[in-house]
């Protein structure tokens, strides 16, 4: 079946260093290493934070109508989308840079619109979605490129932006499996708000790690809303 997307026209953009990195063998290895069925996915979060991902999602979007149109940017194999389906959401889209992950997602997720593409150039009309979200994606975007991908997320959202990312009060680079320049943590909600004054922070929750090996680290979920003009 061929899916038709409500596209906007744009000129092709040059890939960033991070996009090329994740589109290659390293990204494929990440996909194989981190793909889990729903029960294992929830157990993974339970072991890190003492909360399942479904519980975390419900805290932020539990009241969102289940027919809401939702886009996940950087969906990988679609584990988050499966979680949203389990919550009753039915109008779901995912976009993923890495072709291998897209193939896996189309096998793993049923009834979801999955396409290959870049978060820097989302092929959707302005305000098309009720919610645009990321899950551990902004951490892999170079700090100087964050305004560009965030701008696309804001453009495509008619109301809400949600993120789940690593957190630090200031931008901090992290060595990632021996590689430099591919992982950062910061206050991503603050970066959104600094670049888009038309947003307001609805909710933010810091989740400290409960396992001994990661004590002192914490991740964040946040929900932003477009302020009516």
Describe the residue ranges of each PLM region.
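Class I (Rossmann-like) S-adenosyl-L-methionine-dependent methyltransferase catalytic domain
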Residues: 2-123, 141-148, 162-229
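A conserved beta-strand element that flanks and buttresses the S-adenosyl-L-methionine
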Residues: 133
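Short catalytic micro-motifs in class I SAM-dependent methyltransferases
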Residues: 136-140
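A short glycine-rich, Lys/Arg-flanked "PGG" loop and its adjoining helix->strand segment in the class I
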Residues: 147-159
């Amino acid at each position: 079946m061929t899916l038709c997307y409500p596209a906007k026209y744009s000129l092709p953009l040059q890939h960033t260093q991070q996009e090329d990195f994740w589109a290659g063998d390293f990204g494929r290895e990440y996909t194989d290493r981190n793909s889990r069925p729903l029960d294992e996915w929830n157990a993974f979060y339970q072991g890190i934070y003492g909360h399942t991902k479904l519980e975390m999602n419900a805290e932020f979007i539990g009241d969102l109508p289940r027919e809401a149109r939702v886009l996940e940017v950087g969906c990988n194999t679609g584990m988050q989308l499966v979680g949203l389906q389990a919550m009753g959401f039915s109008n779901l889209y995912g976009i993923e840079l890495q072709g291998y992950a897209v193939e896996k997602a189309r096998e793993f997720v049923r009834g979801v619109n999955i396409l290959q593409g870049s978060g820097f150039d989302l092929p959707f009309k302005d305000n098309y979605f009720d919610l645009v979200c990321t899950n551990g994606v902004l951490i892999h975007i170079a700090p100087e490129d964050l305004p560009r991908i965030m701008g696309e997320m804001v453009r495509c959202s008619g109301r809400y932006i949600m993120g789940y990312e690593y957190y630090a009060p200031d931008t901090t680079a992290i060595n990632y499996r021996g590689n430099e320049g591919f992982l950062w943590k910061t206050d991503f909600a603050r970066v959104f708000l600094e670049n888009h004054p038309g947003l307001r922070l609805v909710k933010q929750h810091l989740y400290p790690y409960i396992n001994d090996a990661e004590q002192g680290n914490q991740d964040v979920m946040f929900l932003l809303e477009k302020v009516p003009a």
